[in-house]
C-alpha cells in the first residue's frame, strides 16, 4: 500500500466534501482525493478513498 503525505486540505462545507491534495512517497506521483463526506452536525469528516 502506498504511503501518502498530506500537503494541502481544502474544506468546502457548502458542497459537503473535503478536497485533499498530496503525493505518493514511492513514485512521487501527484494525487487528489475529493471523496470525503462531512457531517454537518459534528463538523467531522470521513474518508471514502478507494
Predicted regions and their residues:
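Short, amphipathic alpha-helical "recognition" segments used to contact nucleic acids or chromatin
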Residues: 1-18
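Short alpha-helical "recognition helix" segments of helix-turn-helix
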Residues: 23-24
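Residues in the recognition helix of alpha-helical DNA-binding motifs
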Residues: 37
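DNA major-groove recognition helices of helix-turn-helix
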Residues: 40-41
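Short Lys/Arg-enriched helix C-cap and helix-to-coil transition segments
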Residues: 44-50
Amino acid at each position: 500500500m502506498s504511503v501518502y503525505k498530506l500537503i494541502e486540505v481544502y474544506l468546502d462545507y457548502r458542497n459537503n466534501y473535503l478536497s485533499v491534495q498530496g503525493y505518493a512517497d514511492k513514485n512521487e506521483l501527484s494525487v487528489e482525493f475529493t471523496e470525503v463526506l462531512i457531517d454537518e452536525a459534528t463538523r467531522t469528516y470521513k474518508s471514502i478513498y478507494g
